[in-house]
Amino acid sequence: MAYDVCVYGGNASGVMAACAAAKEGAKVIVVEPSRWLGGMTGGGLMHIDWGREEAVSGSTRPILKQDFNDAQYRKVFAEMLKSAGVTVLFEHRVSAVLKVDGLIRTVDLDFAPFDEYGCPPAKPTKAMARVIKAKVFIDCSYEGDLMARAGVAYAYGREAKSTYDESLAGAQPPMSVYAIDPYVKAGDPQSGLLPGLQSTPVAPVGEADKLTMGYGFRWRFVFKGESLPIEPPANYDP
């Protein structure tokens, strides 16, 4: 499969990049590891993280101003790509990159459908399922998977305040501290930490560390129509 431009990641940025390239006459494909478009925007995280309205411009601003719900955003993004003549390949993720003279020539893709809860599998259903050849590759994934596979240098974690003379860089003190016991058996460090917790110490204020932002899950609530009751679990202890 040969294209002028391959955009890896069908989130909002990937959709806009693909449409911009298509407007210039390029033959474009979007490769999206999940089964939907829009990334976090298509998943329901819209205006709550928009910030200052004047910071958003170009083709993106009129879309965000519509204030769609997540399903509508996914539909809008799909219609945009279809109208632009962009091919979309869902449920495939990068597994290998071929570079020649420092340029990406092809990418190998695994077929790895997400499960019913929207979680990516540890192992693909079919390895090396597709090969994409393109003149230009754009990595719009949140994690930078294509970039990493291509051997591009990158950094993660927090840089020290002194690295770029940024007053608020580096580790920062916690905004809040909650009295929640972190151990499997309350008060017993020997019982181990609860799932998802780690014992890595936070660096001194202003210093660098290799910690990244924790994942958060947000639920979309509706008050009529498709709403379902929220029942407390059997072992819920308020």
Model-derived features with residue positions:
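Small-residue (primarily alanine) positions within well-ordered alpha-helices
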Residues: S13, A17-A22
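Conserved N-terminal/central alpha/beta ligand/cofactor-binding core
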Residues: A20, A26-K27, V31-L103, A134, ...
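Flavin (FAD/FMN)-binding glycine-rich loop and adjacent Rossmann-like elements that form
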Residues: L103-T106, F111-V136, C140-P238
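Beta1/beta-strand and adjacent pyrophosphate-binding region of the FAD-binding site
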Residues: M1-S13
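Structural recognition of the beta-strand scaffold that forms the well-ordered cores
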Residues: C6-Y8, I29-E32, G39-T41, H47, ...
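Short, surface-exposed loop/turn motifs at beta-strand boundaries within globular domains
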Residues: G10, K23-E24, K210-T212
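Alpha-helix N-cap/helix-initiation motif
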Residues: G10-N11, Q66, A127-R130
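Solvent-exposed loop/turn segments at secondary-structure junctions
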Residues: N11-S13, R35-L37, H47-I48, S95-A96, ...
